């Protein structure tokens, strides 16, 4: 074993107290074989290679049962029995029963690794020193003076503030602190849903129904999907009778319906959800993902109201999907035709984001600026940002890389760099970096090499020479997601821990998703459907405490437009931002976004290799597998 110790297996007696008559078993980074040869007990039920515990640098580990007898892992209140060749992630404090009910060992991370500092501070600092330094250092360090795991631990937002930010999806096997304020599909689809429209690329009905039993009670369900013929036939056989399946038209080759959203109609209003996960098990349990949602009330039908930007963008996008109109009798509300214009019946004046969508086609004239990166360019050009964001860097983070060239990268960065400083001067071009997992990140991930199947970019796209200057590491210690491979897609402009704007989207880095200008920039060609939400520094304090699912009666202020919105600037920041009171307006509202990765990101070293899913990897992963299997 390596001389570096990452932790120990500490023997326990039947009362789960430390058994001092037996020695602790040291663990090193990488595979540790545990069995009869190094466990100081005499029991023939223990194999010589009873289990392999593969420890990662962050202290988490994967346990693989190698012997013929089962092993039990107790994590919190959960007790899981594993048979031969089954595996599970374990964390600090978990208890392993080498034989069920016998030979207890606690997995303990060494103190030097338990609370790793984020590029600031040392392991042997006194807590009081760290607290003093926390208040003394500027906010644009990377969480300086604050432990990595404290960042997501402190992300607690009241219900009325949730639409101002987004949330990460819950990841199985992570310690509790890493899932603070995270959500599962059951947290989203709940209550008395009358109509559900589920928009996605991949849909596994066999997983979806047990994962979200509330769907079985919804009278009208429309699934807008991007599945192929084989899966579609299975979906038709397995779906409920009241479900409608629809695949939107794809007029240009190599396009997909890739948008991930939900529209849930309630007696009191509509819930709009935009997220990054396919409707499959691994996406909602094993990946780093993001989700935004907001509830909106029905409009007062007796009061004429004009649409807002959010409403117009939403209805324009829904109209492009061309789903078959259907009738729905909504109890207490009446009969309705469920088509895109039905969604004009809700009041979106409190929307906290702008929609950035893509639809396939050759877009010209007024439509040139309605979709893709030209829509983002247009919205940003209408915005004013703090002067500190002039020439500030850009981040492109996604999970699939298209076939790109330098000309198109310049076209995209021109859109991403749009906007003006508060003195009316342009922000200017920002230098982009691409956050992309390395081969080693995938190999050591929660899923091992299998996690790379959801990062489906071929070597010919990834290993283009001009991309080398863009590569940056996926590091997510402060959210506990270093080993939860990213399927989330985000684009942002930042300075330190402050964000000029932030886009959570289904769009990967590809011409198919964002569009490519043609014909002397007079036409934008897009192949795919995409949808994202753009967070901007707002000059209005939005009333967004309306809920479709709580039991209280919404106040009048929450049912319609805000008559006297308080003018107040909002500042967007990461979870590791520290308020030094030096660069922040006292009257401004600070909105924390759970950006899962570290900013600024660490550039690739000469040893780092970007992941390509069609290469062969012979170094075994955390489950002892090679790639492809």
Q: Predicted segments — roles?
A:
Residues 2-50, 54-57, 74-92, 97-629:
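PLD/PLD-like phosphodiesterase catalytic module centered on the HKD motif
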Residues 65:
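Flexible glycine-/small-residue-rich
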Residues 69-72:
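Short, solvent-exposed loop/linker segments at beta-strand-coil boundaries, enriched for Pro/Gly
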Residues 59-62:
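Short aromatic-glycine-enriched beta-strand elements
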């Amino acid at each position: 074993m390596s001389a570096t110790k990452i932790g120990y297996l500490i023997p326990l007696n039947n009362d789960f107290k430390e058994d001092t008559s037996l020695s602790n078993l040291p663990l090193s980074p990488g595979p540790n074989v545990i069995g009869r040869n190094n466990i100081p007990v005499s029991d023939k039920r223990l194999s010589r290679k009873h289990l392999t515990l593969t420890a990662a640098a962050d202290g988490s580990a994967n346990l693989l049962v190698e012997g013929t007898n089962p092993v039990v892992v107790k994590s919190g209140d959960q007790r899981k029995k594993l048979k031969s060749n089954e595996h599970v992630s374990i964390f600090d404090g978990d208890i392993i029963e080498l034989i069920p009910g016998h030979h207890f060992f606690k997995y303990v991370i060494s103190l030097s690794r338990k609370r790793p500092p984020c590029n600031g501070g040392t392991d042997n600092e006194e807590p009081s020193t760290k607290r003093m330094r926390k208040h003394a250092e500027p906010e644009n360090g990377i969480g300086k003076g604050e432990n990595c795991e404290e960042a997501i631990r402190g992300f607690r937002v009241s219900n009325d503030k949730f639409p101002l930010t987004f949330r990460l999806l819950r990841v199985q096997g992570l310690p509790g602190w890493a899932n603070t304020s995270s959500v599962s599909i059951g947290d989203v689809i709940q209550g008395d849903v009358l109509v559900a429209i589920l928009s996605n690329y991949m849909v596994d009905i066999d997983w979806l129904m047990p994962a979200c039993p509330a769907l079985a009670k919804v009278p009208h369900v429309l699934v807008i999907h991007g599945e192929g013929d084989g899966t579609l036939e299975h979906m038709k056989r397995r779906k409920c009778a009241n479900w409608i399946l629809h695949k939107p038209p794809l007029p240009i080759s190599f396009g997909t319906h890739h948008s991930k959203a939900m529209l849930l109609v309630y007696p009191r209003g509509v819930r709009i959800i935009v997220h990054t996960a396919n409707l499959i098990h691994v996406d909602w349990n094993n990946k780093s993902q993001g989700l935004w949602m907001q509830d909106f009330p029905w409009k007062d039908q007796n009061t004429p109201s004009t649409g807002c930007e959010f409403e117009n963008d939403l209805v324009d996008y829904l109209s492009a999907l061309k789903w078959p109109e259907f009738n729905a009798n909504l109890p207490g509300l009446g009969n309705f035709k469920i088509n895109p214009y039905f969604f004009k019946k809700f009041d979106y004046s409190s929307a906290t984001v702008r929609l950035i969508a893509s639809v396939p086609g050759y877009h010209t004239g007024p439509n040139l600026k309605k979709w893709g990166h030209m829509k983002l360019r247009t919205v940003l050009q209408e915005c004013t940002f703090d002067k500190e964001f002039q020439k500030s860097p850009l981040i492109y983070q996604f999970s699939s890389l298209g076939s790109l060239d330098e000309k198109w990268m310049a076209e995209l960065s021109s859109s991403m760099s749009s906007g003006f400083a508060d003195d009316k001067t342009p922000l200017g071009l920002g230098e982009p970096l691409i956050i992309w997992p390395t081969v080693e990140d995938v190999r050591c991930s929660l899923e091992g090499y299998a996690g790379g199947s959801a990062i489906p970019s071929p070597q010919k796209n990834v290993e283009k020479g001009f991309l080398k200057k863009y590569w940056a590491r996926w590091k997510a210690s402060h959210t506990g997601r270093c080993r939860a491979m990213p399927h989330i897609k985000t684009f942002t402009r930042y300075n330190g821990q402050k964000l000029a704007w932030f886009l959570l989207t289904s769009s990967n880095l590809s011409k198919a998703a964002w569009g490519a200008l043609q014909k002397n920039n007079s036409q934008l060609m897009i192949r795919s459907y995409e949808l994202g939400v753009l967070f901007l520094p707002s000059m209005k304090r939005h009333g967004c405490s309306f809920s479709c699912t709580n039991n209280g009666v919404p106040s009048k202020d929450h049912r319609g437009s805000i008559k006297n919105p308080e003018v107040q600037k909002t500042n967007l920041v990461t979870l590791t931002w520290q308020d030094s009171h030096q660069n922040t307006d006292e009257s401004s509202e600070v909105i924390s976004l759970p950006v899962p990765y570290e900013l600024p990101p660490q550039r690739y070293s000469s040893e780092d290799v970007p992941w390509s899913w069609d290469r062969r990897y012979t170094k075994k992963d955390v489950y002892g597998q090679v790639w492809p299997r």
